[in-house]
Amino acid sequence: YGDLFTPRQLVALTTFSDLVQEAIEKCRQDAIAAGLPDDGVGVDAGGTGALAYAEAVGVYLAFALSKQADLGNNLCRWEPVAQCPRQLFGRQAIPMIWDFAEGNPLGESSGAWVVFVEGIAKAFAKTFEFVAVKASGLSTQADAGCQDVSNAKVVSTDPPYYDNIGYADLSDFFYVWLRRSLREIFPELFATLATPKTAELVATPYRHGSKEKAESFFLEGMTQAM
């Protein structure tokens, strides 16, 4: 997706991405000064000390980096009513446009880093109001076709729709930037250069050789998952 950014936009994204790691170290030092234990256990290992705190802040900043990529590329459209740039992904596809609008990442309006950070902070503040301080959770990745976590449980999900959406291909737009900032925190999650695609449950003929093979792959996989 490198061609979807101007050289100036790539410089901005690369700079913000590099600063995420600097911010993590600064947060760690501040957390230690505030009295959090410096146990060296990261957030991926379930840590609760200074390092885990700093890495969690880094994850939130990476969310802002994703917003920056979405609103800082050469396919952002102009919104005539609000008079501001709009994001690339208005739907689950990359659009074609005649011209593009570009915000100022160092400004204070649409497309600015400070706007992304403040928006994410407000969203988390509202979310955390409903989460107990001592509440703990666990998230894992597993193949839906062979996992047993959902046995005897009701699971509500929005499944893939044949070849309607190229989830993994589109995810690479954000994945490469997240990996650049977070692979030291989540080495297993970001082990690959791009998102895994071989086992993705979508009926894409170009990946399976024909429409019939793609449909068969999708139906068999969906049957196992169900």
Model-derived features with residue positions:
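Soluble or luminal CAZymes and related metallo-dependent hydrolases
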Residues: 217, 221
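Nucleic-acid modification enzymes, centered on SAM-dependent nucleic-acid methyltransferases
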Residues: 1-153, 160, 164-211, 222-225
